[in-house]
Amino acid sequence: MLKKKRLIKILYGLVASVTALTALFFALAYGWLGIHDGPGVITEARIPEEIISKRELTQSNSRKKIGAKGAKQILFGDLHVHTTYSFDAFIGSLPMMHGEGSRPLGDACDFARFCSALDFWSINDHAEASTPRRWSETIESIQQCNAVGGHGNNPDTVAFLGWEWTQEGGTPDTHYGHKNVIFRDIETEKVP
């Protein structure tokens, strides 16, 4: 009798396991748990040369107006940019959080170029949420963003490759917090 009860428990466990695995298979196959949106599309146009020239002229005139000496240029940038590859940005972008939806890498490049007029920026999605696929897409997107921006002495924006590394410790001595890792190079063979 005891053996029979034990066999019934094992049988129930097997049926439950097979049912759970089947449900998981269908959930993954039909995208019920979400789908990978990919890196998005970067607009294949840089800021028109007239606009860049106008910005430079405005800066030069402003420099003269206040009597500043020298020709140094102030650059504006953002070295902490997240896309929805980062969990916190993903949650904040959900419509139920009053967000506007997915914000992929292509949107980050376009926003830096056309909306915020950044001279430079760095992608810094959370390293903990990265996968080999996402990292590869990140590298390709940053390379594309810079290719559109133009090479040489006057690109419309410069995109840097990087990630945000987070370490939380239980004491001040072991807590390092958030650190942005930013690479000088974007060539595939020069980055991890």
Regions found by a protein language model. Name each.
Residues M1-K9:
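N-terminal Lys/Arg-rich, disordered targeting/topogenic segments
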Residues I10-P192:
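Extended, charged catalytic domains and RNA/DNA-binding interfaces, predominantly
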